[in-house]
Amino acid sequence: RLGERVAAGSTQTHRGSKESSYWANPFPLLKDNDGKILAMRAKNYANVGAYLSSRGTLPPVANLGTAAGTYDVPAMHIDVTAVYTNTNPLCPFRGNGRPEASYVIERLIDLAADEIGMDAAELRRINQIPPEAIPYKTALTFTYDSGNFGDNLEKGLVMGDYAGFAARREDSKKNGKLRGIGVSNSIERAGAPSLESAEIRFDATGTVTLYAGTTQQGQG
């Protein structure tokens, strides 16, 4: 209609084709007086846009099995509802489902820490899955076969100078700026199942032919 060629950059393409937005409404964690997590519940809403794309329902549910993150959560209940809106269709980007799952548990922990007056890093520390509990079966069916999550947390706190944050925040206030800090522990599963297959054929001449399928992972 324009009578001219149109070339869209990455920003225009993201805004005009598909997007990866997500709504999460976490409920408070059930915890004891010492901050130990007893149960988790969340009701999440996924904005799938005006039309459902081929994989539009993947981001809200792709990583629910690890929604507990690296924390020992004995009981969990998560409800996910996909809703149509007047926005672009939802499409998986890199890290499909991982940020969504991590956000829920990490946000709940931050809210719980504020509620009981405990440092957010300390609350994470006392709820980490201990190495001796591995292999660990989560309340949402996944089993973690390896991991030293507490050690990872401590290294991250040191590298990010978590202990020195209060002083940095005060310096920012003096300059009329606000400074915040966040902590997030994420876990990644490997070898997710797919529909690929392999076939070996032997012919009369003794030649062996191997047919193997592969799935592109989006790394170029």
Where is each model-derived feature located?
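Short, ordered loop/turn segments at secondary-structure junctions
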Residues: 9-11, 128, 215
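Long hydrophobic segments that form regular secondary structure
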Residues: 92-134, 202-208, 220
